[in-house]
Regions:
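Bacterial N-terminal signal peptides that target proteins for export
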Residues: 1-8
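Bacterial N-terminal signal peptides
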Residues: 8-16
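N-terminal leader/linker segments that initiate helical-solenoid repeat arrays
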Residues: 19-73
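Solenoid-like repeat scaffolds
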Residues: 25-26, 56-65, 92-101, 130-138, ...
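Conserved small-residue packing positions in alpha-helical repeats and bundles
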Residues: 40-41, 75, 113, 148
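Alpha-helical adaptor scaffolds
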Residues: 73-141
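Terminal, low-structured helical/coil segments at or just beyond the last alpha-helical repeat
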Residues: 166-211
Length: 211
């Protein structure tokens, strides 16, 4: 598994170079773009059992068109099963093999961010979401609530309110009531929705001015 050790080194370098680079752009006025390619879970083969994982490893070893999606799917399974270091190494392999301008790259950042966030690595997750936005012309609908969640979780609460305000500006009838969160954010956990409800309460108490 030398390639996993190589991947771990690559990821360590990636995280080291971005650790101090968590400055987000100021929120834009509106975020209407669906950005479906980014927010779709990376799945090469349906399933999450040992047989599926073995087939995914075969795709990785063949290094064909689906190899990086297979790596990302394996990485998620590894991180969710307690093998975080191996999962990180697998993600690093996928990043190394994916061009900066590839549509897959933003999806890798988005998926890796969620895996990091759910392991309690909120600052790292925030930086991965930032990179999912970097250099792109879209203004994705996922960005305001997701960045609000990450910023609030890292203690950057004024910035979290700015991003939540962008969600409300974009879809005021959707984001002005946390009761809608289960419908709007079906893949979020209850704890994540509760955290966003804290952001909402703070925004409601003192909504930031625009611009």
């Amino acid at each position: 598994m030398g390639y996993l050790r190589t991947g771990a080194c690559a990821l360590a370098l990636l995280l080291a170079t971005t650790a101090g680079a968590q400055t987000l752009p100021a929120p834009a006025e509106f975020y209407f773009d669906a950005d479906t390619r980014t927010v779709t879970p990376l799945v090469a083969i349906e399933g999450d059992d040992d047989q599926t994982h073995a087939r995914l490893m075969q795709l990785v070893d063949r290094n064909g068109r689906a190899a990086e999606t297979a790596r990302a799917q394996l990485a998620r399974a590894l991180m969710r099963s307690g093998r975080e270091d191996t999962g990180r190494a697998m993600y690093a392999q996928a990043f190394t093999a994916t061009a900066n301008r590839s549509p897959l790259r933003s999806a890798l950042h988005w998926n890796f961010a969620w895996d990091l966030y759910r392991l309690g690595h909120h600052a790292e997750a925030l930086d991965q979401w930032r990179q999912a936005l970097d250099g792109r012309l879209v203004r994705p609908a996922w960005a305001p609530p997701t960045l609000a969640l990450a910023l609030w979780s890292t203690g950057r609460r004024d910035e979290a309110l700015q991003w939540y305000a962008a969600a409300v500006r974009t879809e005021p009838n959707l984001w002005n009531d946390p009761a809608r969160y289960p419908t709007l954010l079906p893949d979020w956990t209850d704890a994540e929705r509760r955290t966003l409800a804290e952001v909402f309460a703070a925004w409601q108490a003192a909504p930031p001015a625009w611009p």
